[in-house]
Amino acid sequence: MAGKLMHALQYNSYGGGAAGLEHVQVPVPTPKSNEVCLKLEATSLNPVDWKIQKGMIRPFLPRKFPCIPATDVAGEVVEVGSGVKNFKAGDKVVAVLSHLGGGGLAEFAVATEKLTVKRPQEVGAAEAAALPVAGLTALQALTNPAGLKLDGTGKKANILVTAASGGVGHYAVQLAKLANAHVTATCGARNIEFVKSLGADEVLDYKTPEGAALKSPSGKKYDAVVHCANGIPFSVFEPNLSENGKVIDITPGPNAMWTYAVKKITMSKKQLVPLLLIPKAENLEFMVNLVKEGKVKTVIDSKHPLSKAEDAWAKSIDGHATGKIIVEP
């Protein structure tokens, strides 16, 4: 597709928010030997996308400008690199793009073969594009630090999910229920019934005294917390944890890293665990199959055309989406 142009959104410096996004015409990317080129059908946004733009993660994920953001995509393979063996033109897929390179807010993008999986016809493009960062974060948190078995054969655990109506949270509730866990969740008052519909056993309004204290209405102590919210210190979680309880922080900041270090040094049984997502194709395929089988559902907050993707960007920054925000070319 050499020489063909496509519509994309990019930013040229740190900061700027939605106003910093610029509509441009740029060349369609050419896949390297280990890459596939996709005609995109859906892209989902994650908070990490605008945090990168803001410069909040600059030491770990420095930008090269101009930058086309977003990493979670679904589409159709239109070209494959010379070394690609498992995909061909016409395949419907879902992929995780590199946070270093991005590329999702465009009509076409290139993805590595090792982070691309086939998408069955039963799973729509938007449903699939929502999965990579949010779904894989929830899966990794619950199966690795929390140690749950999603076939329900493990020991029954008590799990707390904060910000349970958001992207990661709504997957975490559903996955924890597959593991036969007792799930307590927090969210805003308007989303209580929604979070209950996902399977949560107890739902707390985070603005009430009980919700702010994170206390289980049934008095349970949490074996693990999938912490998707911001601004809650470990001291609030600690009295609500079981003897070996863990708080798995999916967006760890400096305070979380300090608490993690202190708890390690003092050999505390109650731990704060910062989560660094390691995307794996087999995990993405697992999540896609759960959606195909109806065991997990993707909840779409809103869909936006690429021509108005800055509205989706602003909505993500606002931080009150229920489920996932999708951009469609």
Swiss-Prot record:
Record note on quaternary structure? Homodimer or homotetramer. Transition to monomer upon NADPH binding. Interacts with calmodulin. Interacts with HP30-1, HP30-2 and HP20.
**Looking at the keywords, is Plastid present?**
yes
SUPFAM superfamilies, sorted: GroES-like, NAD(P)-binding Rossmann-fold domains
| Note in the entry | The trimeric TOC159/75/34 complex is not involved in chloroplast import of CEQORH.
Question: Regarding domains, what does the record say?
Answer: A nonterminal hydrophilic domain (59-100) is essential for targeting to the chloroplast. The C-terminal part (101-329) is necessary and sufficient to select for the import site.
Looking up InterPro entries in the UniProt record yields:
ADH-like_N, Chloroplast_QOR, GroES-like_sf, NAD(P)-bd_dom_sf, PKS_ER
UniProt-annotated location(s): Plastid, Chloroplast inner membrane
Induction of expression:
Not regulated by 2,6-dimethoxy-p-benzoquinone (DMBQ).
Name of the gene encoding the protein in the UniProt record:
CEQORH
Q: What does this protein do?
A: NADPH-dependent alpha,beta-unsaturated oxoene reductase reducing the double bond of medium-chain (C9) to long-chain (C18) reactive electrophile species deriving from poly-unsaturated fatty acid peroxides. The best substrates are 13-lipoxygenase-derived gamma-ketols, but is unable to reduce the double bond of short-chain alkenals and alkenones such as acrolein, crotonaldehyde, 3-buten-2-one, 4-hexen-3-one and trans-2-hexenal, or quinones such as duroquinone, decylubiquinone, coenzyme Q0, menadione, menaquinone and phylloquinone.
Q: Per the similarity annotation, which family is this?
A: Belongs to the zinc-containing alcohol dehydrogenase family. Quinone oxidoreductase subfamily.
Single GO MF annotation: oxidoreductase activity
Which positions are annotated as binding substrate? 58
The answer to keyword Oxidoreductase applying to this record is: yes
Q: What is its EC number?
A: 1.3.1.-
Any one GO CC term of this protein is:
plant-type vacuole
Going by the UniProt record, its keywords in alphabetical order are: Chloroplast, Membrane, NAD, Oxidoreductase, Plastid, Plastid inner membrane
**Name of this protein:** Chloroplast envelope quinone oxidoreductase homolog
Its organism's taxonomic lineage begins at: Eukaryota, Viridiplantae, Streptophyta, Embryophyta, Tracheophyta
Q: Which Pfam families does the UniProt entry name for this protein?
A: ADH_N, ADH_zinc_N_2
Superkingdom of the organism of origin: Eukaryota
